[in-house]
């Protein structure tokens, strides 16, 4: 019997109780704000939506005043938010329950390690596997930080619901506190008044480390080692999870990312992790009251204690406390040295004898900062060894062991920061350098072969650099060189791992990679033997993915590249872009091209003796590579995951997965288990069968690509339809990220960034990028020969890639609503533009019918009852928001709203994104 996924659906009765209570409180608060008469409008709207009487609903909404719209749109935005919290709480409860009762579930790490332990290479896999979630600042998180903080309080209160029901805590006081926070949310601005700055994005993402990720990653790694040990596998220093980050280093299309933001990103990280260590050591200081009159520490602990400036008479016989105090003192100095900030939380409130900081002894014996995390860990190891010498192994478990584990994982920063820039920017900078050095006057006009010859010659000219103080530089070149210089300084200061990769957006040639090498060489990050920053191509469009094999084969053939890769443990990372390939060719073409590219690139790596590792640039929606993480990883081509995989975690997905430590632990556990299972499990053993599957997919995808591009790029009215029948203009003005919605002025679909493209299709409920072109392509294949439907059904049952592909379409279709989409189509001014909707509608119906036929299902989401139930409970609420949004857009475009009222549209955008739970 297959294992089930952990889902909150097992607690539907509790969720129903919680939602009823939350709804009752929100209704009372709203009624008090607007009065009984106005609240009857909300009640009538709700009834019409539940009955799906959309014609009457449209009429009622059209008669609501702008003033009434504000509270009504807030009500219907906050209600799905509260439902989300209830579901998240009960998922966390389910996770804890299943773990504490030792129940098996899909992706459980204990099962994965147990299955692996019996294999000959089991220990090697466990030692080497490394999954890297990379948190990005992509503008899809529509919630303000203030709102997220309030929802965190509500989440904590709902965690106590069962205790309140049982009388373990005072029910009335619990209800009052819950009511208070809901009232605060209802009266707090949902929408940001100003656009986020990069520094805000850095600060915002740090709350996830502070609140959940540090603890979850540390606990999971400790458990990982313990589980391996249980099966006789002693692991040295495994890192099954390490974290990555783009915020502060991703300047592709974002002019606000600079050398200063890169430095700030690393510095804030360092501050957060050092504060964590200081807090944890303060707790250990309070706990370790062991007296030397009862148990004698070893000489190293005595040495640490003797260096402490905690000279309190009450600590004379407590060497462990004094040793921890000394370690804390050194951490404080380390924080000052690395961040130029004092230890923010190092105070008497966490148990320290703060008077010791200014004691005379501190002048005679100055405390020195740690040179590296290795030195910090050595002091902790000394305490551990002393405890072991005295037979106190039980005292090591828990806080001390987890702090030591955290040091191994994080060191003095939390996540490796990626740099990213568009290839065209690098080409412009290199062209300027070559011209300024009188080497090539017009580099951009050279052929690809000529470019590579020039670049390789310069890379071999050591230690010569191209830039000169005597030659004036453009602002762009100055800015780029400043960023690379800062990267080198941060690596020297915090360690090599703080910045390991530089990603090249829109990689189209080998010269794109050598151009980056030239820029890195200018600041000393690349020479003939070594690349301190790995050059990572990002292949994004269908054409670039098709060409990726030849590009990488040519790149890997160069001796200098082999030297660079050798210094990186023989790994070459390649990033795959899901968003642009989807916008370029549609869902099927994107998914299949990415699948084939991984197979081809893996083979090229093997030919050159290089381990190709993949970085998956996935978004929250299916149209941007989203979907269940476990299924996404286990459906990758067999052999494409060697031992390392990186994937982006973006926008609202970060909050959904890492908003609390229990759910964070579970999602990280899923990532590790999925990666290990894909590394060792080949689902289809018959090579002839997989070859036939590929032939079928090639045929279907070719048709799908043609169908998709015929509408998106060949239909002269499609551009106007998208811009008039979706809230793309309003989305672009929403203050949800520091980056512009487009790299340049938008005059065609290709110029629009993938995120607002997908976001807007989600808002008008068509979900176009996640399914268009699927139905017609499959229908053509089915109609070609008898038995083709049965072949597709067999593929769905036996091929994880195909199963995941269709399950994602199923999910997207379930969130779409063609009745609502029709109303958005009426926003278009001309009939020929509005008629585009009917092409979309025909394809939607065909896609739904074909998907159900291949799955052999009667209804959508038959395999996903949890999501089906969740959507059923929330759809009536955010369907209302769509009708409100349509009415507000009409008024805005007809100048019936003033500028202050534009935020009403933004409120509906927020609410719809909240209800869908994956916006971009």
UniProtKB/Swiss-Prot annotation:
As given in the record, the signal peptide range reads none
EC numbers: 4.1.1.31
Tell me which InterPro entries the record gives.
PEP_COase (IPR021135), PEP_COase_bac/pln-type (IPR022805), PEP_COase_Lys_AS (IPR018129), PEPCASE_His_AS (IPR033129), Pyrv/PenolPyrv_kinase-like_dom (IPR015813)
Question: Which keywords fit this entry according to its UniProt record?
Answer: Carbon dioxide fixation, Lyase, Magnesium
What GO MF terms are annotated? Answer: magnesium ion binding; phosphoenolpyruvate carboxylase activity
Q: So which cofactors does this thing need?
A: Mg(2+)
Reactions accelerated catalytically: oxaloacetate + phosphate = phosphoenolpyruvate + hydrogencarbonate
- Role of this protein: Forms oxaloacetate, a four-carbon dicarboxylic acid source for the tricarboxylic acid cycle.
Task: Identify the PANTHER family for this entry.
Answer: PHOSPHOENOLPYRUVATE CARBOXYLASE
Designated name of the protein:
Phosphoenolpyruvate carboxylase
What is the name of the gene encoding this protein?
Answer: ppc
């Amino acid at each position: 019997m297959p294992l089930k996924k952990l889902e909150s659906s097992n607690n539907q009765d509790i969720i129903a109780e919680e939602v009823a209570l939350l709804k009752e409180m929100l209704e009372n608060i709203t009624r008090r704000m607007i009065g009984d008469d106005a609240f009857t409008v909300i009640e009538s709207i709700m009834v019409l939506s539940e009955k799906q009487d959309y014609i009457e609903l449209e009429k009622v909404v059209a008669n609501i005043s702008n003033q009434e719209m504000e509270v009504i749109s807030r009500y219907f935005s906050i209600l799905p938010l509260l439902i989300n919290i209830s579901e998240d709480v009960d998922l966390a409860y389910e996770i804890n329950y299943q773990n504490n009762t030792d129940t098996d579930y899909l992706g459980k790490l204990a099962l994965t390690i147990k299955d692996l332990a019996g294999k000959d290479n089991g220990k090697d896999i466990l030692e080497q596997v490394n999954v890297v979630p990379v948190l990005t600042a992509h503008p899809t998180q529509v919630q303000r930080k203030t709102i997220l903080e309030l929802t965190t309080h509500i989440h904590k209160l709902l965690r106590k619901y069962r205790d309140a029901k049982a009388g373990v805590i005072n029910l009335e006081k619990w209800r009052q506190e819950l009511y208070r926070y809901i009232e605060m949310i209802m009266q707090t601005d949902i929408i940001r008044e100003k656009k986020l700055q990069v520094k805000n994005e850095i600060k915002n993402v740090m709350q996830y480390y502070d609140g959940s990720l540090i603890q979850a990653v540390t606990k999971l790694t400790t458990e990982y080692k313990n589980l391996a040990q249980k099966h006789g596998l002693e692991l040295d220093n495994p890192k099954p999870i390490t974290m990555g980050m783009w915020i502060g280093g991703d300047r592709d299309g974002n002019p606000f990312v600079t050398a200063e933001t890169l430095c700030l990103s690393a510095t804030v990280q360092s501050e957060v992790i050092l504060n964590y260590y200081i807090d944890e050591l303060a707790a250990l200081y309070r706990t370790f009251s062991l007296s030397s009159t009862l148990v004698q520490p070893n000489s190293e602990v005595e040495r640490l204690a003797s260096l402490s400036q905690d000279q309190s008479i009450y600590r004379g016989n407590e060497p462990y406390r004094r040793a921890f105090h000394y370690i804390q003192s050194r951490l404080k100095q380390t924080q000052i040295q690395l961040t130029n900030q004092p230890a923010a939380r190092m105070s008497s409130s966490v148990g320290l004898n703060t008077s010791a900081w200014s004691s005379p002894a501190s002048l005679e014996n100055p405390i020195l900062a740690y040179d590296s995390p290795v030195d910090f860990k050595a002091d902790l190891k000394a305490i551990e060894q002393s405890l072991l010498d005295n037979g106190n192994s039980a005292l090591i478990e828990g806080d001390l062991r987890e702090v030591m584990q955290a040091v191994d994982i994080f060191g003095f920063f939390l996540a490796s920061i990626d740099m990213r820039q568009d290839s065209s920017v690098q080409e412009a900078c290199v062209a300027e350098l070559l011209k300024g050095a009188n080497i090539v006057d017009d580099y951009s006009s050279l052929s690809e072969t000529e470019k590579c010859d020039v670049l390789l010659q310069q890379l071999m000219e050591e230690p010569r650099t191209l830039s000169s103080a005597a030659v004036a530089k453009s602002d762009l070149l100055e800015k780029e060189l400043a960023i690379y210089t800062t990267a080198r300084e941060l690596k020297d200061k915090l360690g090599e791992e703080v910045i390991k990769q530089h990603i090249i957006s829109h990689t189209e040639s080998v010269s794109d990679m050598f151009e980056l090498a030239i820029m890195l060489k200018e600041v000393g990050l690349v020479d003939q033997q070594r690349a301190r920053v790995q050059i990572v191509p990002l292949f994004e469009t269908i054409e670039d993915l098709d060409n990726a094999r030849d590009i990488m084969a040519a790149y890997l053939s160069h001796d200098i590249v082999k030297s660079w890769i050798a210094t990186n443990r023989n790994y070459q990372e390649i990033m795959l872009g899901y968003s642009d390939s989807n916008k370029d060719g549609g869902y099927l073409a994107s998914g299949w091209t990415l699948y084939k590219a991984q197979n081809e690139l893996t083979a090229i790596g093997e030919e050159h003796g290089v381990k190709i590792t993949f970085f998956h640039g996935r978004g929250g929606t299916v149209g941007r590579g989203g979907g269940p993480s476990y299924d996404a990883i286990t459906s990758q081509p067999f052999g494409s995951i060697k031992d390392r995989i990186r994937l982006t975690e973006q926008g609202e997905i970060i909050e959904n997965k890492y908003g609390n430590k229990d759910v964070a632990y579970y999602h990280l556990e899923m990532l590790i288990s999925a990666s290990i299972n894909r590394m060792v499990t080949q689902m289809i053993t018959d090579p002839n069968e997989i070859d036939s599957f590929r032939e079928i997919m090639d045929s279907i995808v070719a048709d799908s690509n043609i169908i998709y591009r015929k509408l998106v790029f060949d239909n002269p009215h499609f551009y106007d339809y998208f811009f008039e029948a979706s809230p793309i203009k309003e989305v672009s003005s929403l203050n949800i990220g520091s980056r512009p919605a487009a790299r340049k002025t938008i005059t065609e679909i290709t110029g629009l960034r993938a995120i607002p493209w997908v976001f807007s299709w989600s808002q008008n409920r068509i979900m176009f990028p996640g399914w268009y072109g699927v139905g017609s392509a499959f229908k053509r294949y089915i109609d070609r020969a008898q038995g083709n439907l049965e072949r597709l059904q067999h593929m769905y049952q036996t091929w994880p890639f195909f199963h995941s592909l269709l399950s994602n379409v199923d999910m997207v279709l379930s969130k779409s609503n063609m009745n609502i989409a029709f109303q958005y189509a009426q926003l278009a001014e001309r009939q020929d533009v509005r008629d585009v909707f009917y092409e979309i509608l025909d394809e939607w119906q065909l896609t739904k019918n074909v998907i159900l036929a291949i799955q052999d299902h009667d209804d959508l989401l038959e395999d996903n009852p949890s999501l089906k139930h969740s959507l059923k409970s929330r759809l009536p609420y955010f369907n209302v928001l769509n009708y409100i949004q349509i009415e507000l857009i009409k008024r805005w475009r007809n100048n019936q709203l003033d500028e202050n009222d534009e935020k009403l549209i933004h409120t509906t955008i927020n609410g719809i994104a909240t209800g869908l739970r994956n916006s971009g």
